[in-house]
């Protein structure tokens, strides 16, 4: 089943149906999470799977990246719910617990897979964070999710 879903996501991307591709891609952590953590609830397994297989490679814990927002499991789960249940391509920061990922501005952008996600932080005079922004490349995100799901499906599903 994963192979067919990935094939259809890729067809959507090739035909520039970016929101359709994203909506389907955001279901992959549900499917893979169910296979990997069958006894966990939906929210827990989605976030857990995403944190383990996607977010672990997005999070920058270097001194220059420690404040930067990133694609956490919470962010992707929030985006999944917004798109699939509300038709809204935005996230609700108040529902995200990780302070680092509570963004003031969230944008979905369309570009090639070579164009990654960007995050920025603005500091006030007292070096306190006053603004966080996260731009997520739809094609890049779909590619990360599909390739990860395909790779893991060979092992688990």
Predicted regions span which residues?
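Charged alpha-helical initiation segments
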Residues: 1-19
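Short, hydrophobic/aromatic alpha-helical segments in well-folded domains
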Residues: 5-8, 24-27, 79
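Anionic, Ser/Thr-rich low-complexity intrinsically disordered regions
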Residues: 17, 37-41, 90-108
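Short runs of predominantly hydrophobic/aromatic residues within well-ordered alpha helices
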Residues: 18-25, 73-76, 138
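Short, contiguous, well-structured surface segments enriched in hydrophobic/aromatic residues
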Residues: 19-60
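Histidine-centered, metal-coordinating catalytic motifs and their short helical/loop contexts
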Residues: 69-98
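A contiguous, mid-protein "functional segment" used to position or interact
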Residues: 108-153
